Structures are given as structure tokens and as C-alpha cells.
Amino acid sequence: MRTRLRFVLVAAALALLSACKEDVAQSIVPQDMTPETLGHYCQMNLLEHPGPKAQIFLEGSPAPLFFSQVRDAIAYARGPEQIAPILVIYVNDMGAAGATWDQPGDGNWIAADKAFYVVGSARRGGMGAPEAVPFSSRDEAAAFVLAEGGQVLALADITDAMVLTPVETGSEPRADDEDYLGRLRALPHPAGG
């Protein structure tokens, strides 16, 4: 009798606990960038880098992953590293009113699968790699091609090689690189050197 009563009490407690669980729909509304918004790969402030940005919402994650280049977001989506299914990808519409290369905008997010991309243009993204420049309008993308070169493609037509191939960003060290290396050389060596 005691075992039966214990079983009934445990079953009732489990039923109550499962009834308390609320299924809350995850928000996938695009979020604006702030001074605290960091790129997923580079962990650098996105507002300090030019060019269009992207954000990816993963199932179960409270906030999106931001990317300093659209190219990087497409590469992430095609790679094996996702920790959860992708719900949606948003990209800056570079044809939106007020969007510039230095200020790609907020509030002009469009679904990545609906965008038209200019690939192979003279423009480089925020991390110095070739960029897949998104537009909500094919006509805006075509106008960008006339000014900057490249070709207009749908997301499905962008090949893996266009976003996954390593890119040389220049072999000449920049002045700030030399300054940094000089400061590193000036540090005392841990072995007493």
C-alpha cells in the first residue's frame, strides 16, 4: 500500500511539473546593433567595421549571432558548426534609404533567402574579405554592379567556393601591426631574457 501511495504521489508531482512548463515562442525579430554587439567570429564591435552585417537566430538561443560580414554568415550556415538549427538569417538591405558602406543601417534587415546578392564586386567587407552585398531589390543590386562590378545572385546560387575559400587580405604589414610587434618585442621574456 505504501509503495502504491508513493507511486501515485510521484506521478502526481510529475504531472504538476509538466503542466507548469510553458511553451514560449522564441522571438526571431531582427535586433538592432549596439556598441556592445560583437561579431561571432572576430568578437569585435560591429559598429567599427564597414559593410553589410548579418544576424542568425538559432533554435533555443535568446539572442542572435551577429556577423561582421554577410559572407561569414553564409559560410556559418553552410558549415558543420551550428549548435542548434538555424531559424532565420537576416542581412542589411544595402539598397535601403540611408544605408551606406560605412553605416549599413539598422531597421533595414531583410530575410537572407529573399535577398539579391552582388558577389565579386570591388567592395570588401568589414574584415577585408570579398563581400556578398545584399539588396531587397534586383534593380538596386544591378545598379550596384554597374558601379562596383560583380554579378547578381540569389542565396541558393552563391557557391560554397564564394564564401568558404580562404582569402589573402594582403601580405604587407600595416603600421599598427609593426607598432604592436614592436611592443611585443619590448616585453621581458618569461625565461629571464
Curated annotation (Swiss-Prot):
A lipid is attached at residue 20 (N-palmitoyl cysteine). The keyword Glycoprotein does not apply. It is a lipid-anchor. It is found in: Cell membrane. The keyword Membrane applies. PANTHER family: HTH-TYPE TRANSCRIPTIONAL REPRESSOR YCNK (PTHR41247:SF1). This is Copper-binding lipoprotein NosL.
